[in-house]
């Protein structure tokens, strides 16, 4: 039976708007299959062993609800985790707009803006229904200091890579000399004029949103 050192057990929290496929992404990673129908999640937890850069880790994964009325519970979930995966659907502009809300909540609860966060755009298999471009996702992630990938829970595209890269992000925060960024993920290098990027991403974004990027 494999035993794990404390620093080889990593707690991850999956957050995002309702209906974006958080559970589908998680179950695809855990069980290698796609769930078409499931009841709305309040809180589910999973464990899986993974190998990242020749190191074995045990991931404790918390799949959370997206409903606004569960904000108090979400604060508790945030405090219990080391890394975060924020999910939106590329077929839903409103879920993309909510990403910054979830990021702000993490920063508020942990009282730090140096938090390991991976942002992912799910449902890229539904290209005909796409409302958010890859470039928009990439630009917002860079602006807010997050890594970024697009995935398909249905086809398993990039699902394993997302979790592996999130492990690297968490470990880099613990030890900046370890786990160099992979070629598949975006660096956290800020853009020069991030306020213009936010405006380009979504002309409906309020001034309160752009102010965060200006401060970075």
UniProtKB/Swiss-Prot annotation:
Its EC number is 3.6.5.2. Residues 214-216 form a propeptide. It catalyses: GTP + H2O = GDP + phosphate + H(+). The modification Cysteine methyl ester is found at residue 213. It comes from the Eukaryota. A motif (Effector region) lies at residues 38-46. Ras proteins bind GDP/GTP and possess intrinsic GTPase activity. This is Ras-like protein rasW. It comes from Dictyostelium discoideum.
